[in-house]
């Protein structure tokens, strides 16, 4: 059944690519430009450095603090990429999978330079976003280690090679990895555009619109896009006419969740189980968004709009905050329901 469904979806996707070829081409170009201008400059240098450190054996001891620091600085899918050396024969324990998920956070360089400075036009907004992402990631790592007693040890020793050879191999590995990331970004940019062109987006967002009548449609579309492809959602958030506090909180949610695109990128490097990965990341994103909303006044003393705060503004902010909560819970419920169905089928077999 799963195979037939996958074949049907692939055939449908190909048909939509033909029917909406101009829009799909524009979306692919947009995804490539986002990768070229934002993702590749922030990730490639760190991919080279982390690859070299791994080949030098710096992470063989499984030092969690060093792993966390490298993953946080390099950005997603750095967590999955760094944890790949702890998988044995293409498989990983549940705790290691959750640890890789917790370490998949967006690069601070992207948040500061691309999102806060370029998209929001307010560099100071990066402070509460980074703090909330850091606190949510630390909480998630602590949970993974406490709940599963994660013990990290490299499954294979790196071969002894001259430093020059290791450096060359690190560059080759980093370029290959960043090109794989490009493929995932372009695919999801095109998928989002096709969903919009076919009108399916309004259908998918209808339950949320009915639940929250005052919800801004553009904000709903931005968050939905971000849950598929994080950079697309971040770009859409930057153009919204919402208070800076709300946009920052929504951004923090998306950056800690990462979206399906980063989940797909993680699969390129590490054997994560999506039925564990996605609910865990949804909760991490929800926690990050709430933390950002709470600490924003303490970290950022500017104001996002002129004039007094009206009841309408407070109501819109409350609805948007509720939307973050609803999206996370609905997404978690859907993924958990799917996981439960899969589990029952496996037990029957």
Predicted region positions:
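N-terminal signal-anchor module of multipass membrane proteins
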Residues: 2-60, 174
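Intrinsically disordered, low-complexity non-transmembrane regions of multi-pass membrane transporters
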Residues: 149-173, 305-311, 315, 339-349
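Alpha-helical transmembrane segments
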Residues: 38-43, 125-141, 323-328
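Transmembrane helix-loop junctions in multi-pass membrane proteins
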Residues: 18-29, 54-59, 113-114, 120, ...
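Hydrophobic mid-bilayer segments of alpha-helices in multi-pass membrane transport proteins
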Residues: 4-15, 42-48, 138, 154, ...
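Alpha-helical membrane segments and immediately flanking helix-loop junctions
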Residues: 62-120, 222-240, 247-270, 278-282
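Transmembrane helical segments that form the transport core of multi-pass membrane transport proteins
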Residues: 171, 175-252
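C-terminal transmembrane helix pair
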Residues: 91-95, 109-110, 138, 244-337
